[in-house]
Amino acid sequence: MADKKGSNSEKLLYCSFCGKSQHEVKKLIAGPSVFICDECIDLCNEIIRDEAAAAGVEASLSRSDLPSPQEIRDILDQYVIGQERAKKILAVAVYNHYKRLKHLDKKDDVELSKSNILLIGPTGSGKTLLAQTLARLLNVPFVIADATTLTEAGYVGEDVENIIQKLLQNCNYEVDKAQRGIVYIDEIDKISRKSDNPSITRDVSGEGVQQALLKLVEGTMASVPPQGGRKHPNQDFIQVDTTNILFICGGAFDGLEKVITDRTEKTGIGFGATVKSKQERDAGEVLRETEPEDLIKFGLIPELIGRLPVVATLGKLDEAALMKILVEPKNALVKQYHKLFAMERVELEIRPGALQAVARKAIRRKTGARGLRSIIEQALLDVMYELPTMKGVSKVIIDENVIDGDGKPLLIYEDTPKVAGSN
């Protein structure tokens, strides 16, 4: 092993791969008449890791032991609390999709169609997390796109083929991998057309985007500029076939429950009819009765609805579910903050009353699980700011008063309890 030396009289040694001298790198490792530096070793390790990951993707999609729907659901349970029916629907749909891909090369009279998925549920109910967890489980390229940023090609904004470009970027422009990936399109409800009737005027960010997405979701050859460039005439494009990409579309669909209720209550007219009041059923129960005609009335075009045959509805998370989300998943928020405080060699205790207060506040804000982190972050801000410069703190206790803003965290200094911010 050749270490760097400061002597001018010594003959300089150079890396045989990058040509850097021993003074430009941390270490030079000697072989028979050759040297390699630490930087080149790191680069080689990175190349090996990338190739191993690529081999893992191919193996995960071609192996005979594709996870069963029950195994997929069990893994979803580790990260997503509640939404049992949605997890079961997703597990079956994803299993069937990748089982279909495994049998593409086999000649058969029956051609299996792709089953893209539509997730309907309020903000913070777990739609995006479900899609992310599925992609991580299957070890396939994954991208999240925001439908509200999309416009028709030729207008200011992103066109739909930018989605495929991002998917390619996520797998280092390996087309075969991208063609078996998962695309999650969020806020799909925000591009609904403004009325039930087809638009007479140009709607470049609503119905126009739906028409553009239709081709992508159904399966087309998307032309993507190489290495993330902009489209220019006479430019070579990367051709990506979207036929086998799984598309998952999600949205809150605020107001859809009213459309469903209006439809279902039409039957309750006349003598002896039993009409349920709208308050008797919660929104989640109503959304489970979603029919294609309701989505058309809401503003999605029939052709796009037809390309999203699997519909899973997610209910609003109640206080008990939000409290479980804080502590039970593998990457639960409370576990994350325990780890952060442990890095300062301090124990963090968040009492059950505090967890309940966090859940209540998230429900009041109508942010669902997505708002939990900001509530905890706000409550712990002062103590996380002061803690690195404090001496002798062994434990921090958070109760419901801290969450509600009526108190401060209790700090344990060896044997003496003190309140954060007190002298």
Curated annotation (Swiss-Prot):
Its keywords, alphabetically, are: ATP-binding, Chaperone, Metal-binding, Nucleotide-binding, Zinc
Q: Which residues bind Zn(2+)?
A: 15, 18, 37, 40
The cross-references to HAMAP family, in alphabetical order and at most eight, read: ClpX
- Report what the protein is called: ATP-dependent Clp protease ATP-binding subunit ClpX
Q: Which InterPro entries match?
A: AAA+_ATPase, ATP-dep_Clp_protease_ClpX, ATPase_AAA_core, Clp_ATPase_C, Clp_protease_ATP-bd_su_ClpX, ClpX_bact, P-loop_NTPase, Znf_CppX_C4
Q: Does the keyword Ion transport apply?
A: no
Lineage, opening ranks: Bacteria, Pseudomonadati, Pseudomonadota, Betaproteobacteria, Burkholderiales
Q: What highest taxon heads this organism's lineage?
A: Bacteria
Organism, by scientific name, is Burkholderia cenocepacia (strain HI2424)
Q: Can you quote a single GO CC term? A: HslUV protease complex
Function, please? ATP-dependent specificity component of the Clp protease. It directs the protease to specific substrates. Can perform chaperone functions in the absence of ClpP.
| Cleavable signal peptide | none
